[in-house]
């Protein structure tokens, strides 16, 4: 497949706002923030390249004069705009340990499809992303988006403890972290779209 120019978001519209408050009576700092930003980590997206377009070598096989594999080109896609994050944090000290936690909600984060499913579905019309191979929905020249905007809630708690003069060092730091994410719209990977799975494990069978 030929590589096309990267898909880029607009240059404007990114902003953030944060506030902090230290509650001295309980020795805890509280924080809150709001962020609106554009995609920073690219997804792999495809374009159905017309079969006579020479910059794609993925021109398919011909049977009875018809292509049985859709010709494709690819590009690195940074185009998701207005990813919104709202978060709340707290930091304190308990029993000599520094403890801090954060709870955040992210809206419209671009989650990449399994790349094997994406290419197979777009080229042959098979697998979880078979819709991308449907010429009635996605004719030649269509952009086949390699991600889906999804919402998530993330919570994490971390701690740091410092011990002077341990194990021959001037200071030993012990760090621990516990976190969890809950996504909305992921669905069942056995029957629907699949996200983030390594392409080394092949394509979906459904």
Protein language model regions, located:
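Residues on the lipid-exposed face of transmembrane beta-strands in outer-membrane beta-barrel proteins
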Residues: 17-21, 32, 88-92, 101, ...
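Transmembrane beta-strands of outer-membrane beta-barrel proteins
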Residues: 28-30, 43, 99-101, 157, ...
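Short loop/turn motifs that connect adjacent beta-strands in outer-membrane beta-barrel proteins
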Residues: 22-29, 93-96, 164-174
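Substrate-recognition/cap regions that form aromatic- and gly/pro-loop-enriched pockets
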Residues: 150, 156-206
């Amino acid at each position: 497949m030929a590589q096309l120019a990267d898909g880029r978001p607009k240059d404007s519209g990114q902003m953030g706002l944060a506030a902090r408050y230290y509650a001295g009576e309980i020795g805890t700092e509280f924080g809150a923030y709001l962020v609106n930003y554009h995609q920073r980590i690219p997804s792999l997206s495809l374009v159905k390249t017309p079969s006579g377009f020479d910059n794609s070598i993925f021109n398919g096989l011909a049977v009875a004069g018809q292509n049985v594999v859709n010709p494709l080109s690819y590009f690195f896609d940074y185009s998701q705009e207005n990813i919104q994050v709202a978060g709340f944090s707290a930091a304190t000290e308990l029993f000599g340990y520094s403890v801090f936690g954060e709870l955040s909600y992210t809206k419209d984060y671009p989650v990449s499809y399994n790349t094997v499913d994406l290419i197979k579905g777009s080229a042959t019309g098979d697998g979880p992303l078979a819709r991308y191979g449907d010429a009635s929905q996605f004719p030649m020249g269509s952009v086949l988006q390699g991600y889906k905007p999804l919402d998530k809630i993330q919570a994490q708690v971390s701690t740091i403890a410092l011990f002077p003069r341990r194990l021959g060092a001037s200071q030993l730091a012990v760090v621990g972290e516990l976190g969890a994410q809950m996504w909305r719209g992921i669905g069942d990977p056995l029957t629907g779209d699949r996200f983030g799975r390594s392409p080394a494990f092949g394509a979906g069978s459904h």
